[in-house]
Amino acid sequence: MSVAGPTLVNVTDTRGTFALTDMPGVRLQDADFTVVDVETTGWSPGAAGITEIGAVRVRGGEVIAEFTSLVNPGTPVPAPITELTGISDPMLALAPPAAAVLPGLLAFAEGSVLTAHNAPFDLAFLTAACAAAGLGWPGFEILDTLKLARHLVSTPDEVPDCKLATLADYFGAPVQPSHRALADARATATVLWHLLGRLADREVYTLGELAAWLAEKDAEAAAARTGVAAVTARRWPLGVARAPRARTPQWLAGPRRWLARVPRLPWRRGRGIR
């Protein structure tokens, strides 16, 4: 059985794309987004490998190119993963390794905003694979559609959750996610464009405005919940707490030598901390 290497399909003229240095002022409808998805043998890049990469490059809501390749992870595919994705060891026997696929992907995505649903997962595998292959990781701008959806889609009023399958169904994506890389990337591309369409009501029109808006929303979300607070002195951590109000008196009521070691105690009250 022969397995083709990386495949480019539906390629059209991509002249007019923007370099990263030009991106902040680029309007959302004019920017290039490369939506990527990876399938893997497990959940951690330290113990698992990539089995498939799919990417869709979109501009103005239109697909201008697609990239897809099976990837030989160098290790057997666990049975539960084969059951989930349909990707098996025989399918990957003659597939290229990640080191042979990644240069094509990086070139495909050059000058675009790299986008994924739950981006930290995909990026962890891609960056680890690049490091293992001795490839430098470009300075991509990154957009996570999961994070964007959590700011723009009401749950549970509109949808019960912001999983890719839920959002793809809600927005009527012509291709539904199926735990195959290209299908999932296509579904994410549809979700992305519907989410970007909601930003006009927030007066967000450019990539720079989107970055600023996301930073503001992330800060608001962090302040609104009681989370993990790390309190540090100049060179060493004083402590970490999930209940800062309860823990701070304990820190400050300790031996006087602790207080003598604290030159400054920076803090800021958040709405989630009372």
Which ranges hold each PLM region?
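Short glycine-rich, Thr/Ser-proximal phosphate-binding strand/loop in the N-terminal lobe
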Residues: R57-P76
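DEDD superfamily 3′-5′ metal-dependent exonuclease/proofreading module
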Residues: M1-A48, V58-E62, P90-R274
